[in-house]
Structure formats: structure tokens, C-alpha cells
């Protein structure tokens, strides 16, 4: 029988951003993926279909396309991150149910994302839920090492002071 833990005793809640804190139906991750493909196509001067093949290969081998471009191409990540996260979020609706659910959770709430802090804030502000999160930990704070790598989690724990036990 699974062990239960009283919700009121949970001190820290950790949320991923993409397709987790916001609904997949928003297509935000798809919007970012389109921008990633555009970046790869421009970087390698190849058509979109070829760029998608390169993108998928880098993602599978390195955990993120960006990490693959950094290792194989010497990419400076800031331009990449700015480009791929430059998406329109003006059509996102306020999510009253999500707002209510977050308001009920005791303890600190954190976002842990392979995106950037500005990208996360852009989305959280659009949904009207930014005020619920004490901390946003991003790929920059993880030294550009993506989740699920152990280094990213160690940096997250170090930065937030969360006791993982």
C-alpha cells in the first residue's frame, strides 16, 4: 500500500514549466520547438526538414538541442535562448482553476525549467500566476546542463536550499 504524506506538511513544491505548469493544449512548447527548428536551419543553412533531423539528433544525444550545439558547434547559448524563447503569449487565457489550486498549496513553490527565467516569467505572468512562485531556476543557473542530468538537480538544490530528503 502506498505511503501517504499530509499535504500540509510539504514545505516545497517543484514544478516543471513546459506542458506541466501550463496545459499542453496551449501549444507553447510547440511554439518554442518551431523557433528551435528555425534557429538550427539558420545556423546550418539548411531547409526546415533537414533542420528538424539535426535538432532531433542533438536533442537525443545531449538532452537539449542547445547543449548539442554548444558541444559540437561551440554555440554561445545566450543568443540561442533569446531567439527560441521569443514567442507570443498574448493569447494565453487566465487559468482560474490553476490559480485556485496553487493558492491552496502550502509551502514554497518553485519552477525548475530547461528554459530561461525571462521565458518562465513571461508565461507565468501571462497566466497571472507568477506571484505564487518564490523561485525560478533555469538552464542558466544549471550551467546550461539540462534536466534530467544530476548536475542540474544538484545546482537546483544548492540554489534553493531545499532538503531533498
Please report, for each region that a protein language model flagged, where it lies by residue:
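A general structural motif
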Residues: 7-10, 106, 164-165
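Short glycine/proline-enriched coil/turn segments at helix->beta-strand junctions
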Residues: 71-74, 105-109, 161-163
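Substrate-recognition "cap/lid" segment bordering the active-site pocket of phosphatases
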Residues: 110, 116-165
Amino acid at each position: 500500500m502506498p505511503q501517504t504524506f499530509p499535504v500540509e506538511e510539504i514545505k516545497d513544491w517543484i514544478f516543471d514549466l513546459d506542458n506541466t505548469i501550463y496545459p499542453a493544449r496551449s501549444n507553447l512548447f510547440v511554439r518554442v520547438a518551431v523557433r528551435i527548428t528555425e534557429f538550427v536551419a539558420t545556423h546550418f543553412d539548411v531547409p526546415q526538414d533537414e533542420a528538424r533531423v539535426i535538432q532531433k539528433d542533438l536533442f537525443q544525444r545531449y538532452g537539449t538541442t542547445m547543449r548539442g550545439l554548444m558541444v559540437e558547434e561551440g554555440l554561445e547559448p545566450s543568443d540561442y535562448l533569446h531567439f527560441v524563447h521569443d514567442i507570443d503569449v498574448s493569447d494565453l487565457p487566465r487559468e482560474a482553476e490553476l490559480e485556485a489550486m496553487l493558492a491552496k498549496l502550502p509551502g514554497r513553490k518553485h519552477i525548475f525549467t530547461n528554459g530561461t527565467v525571462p521565458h518562465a516569467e513571461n508565461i507565468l505572468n501571462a497566466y497571472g500566476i507568477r506571484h505564487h512562485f518564490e523561485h525560478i531556476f533555469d538552464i542558466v543557473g544549471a550551467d546550461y546542463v539540462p534536466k534530467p542530468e544530476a548536475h542540474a538537480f544538484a545546482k537546483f538544490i544548492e540554489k534553493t536550499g531545499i532538503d531533498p530528503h
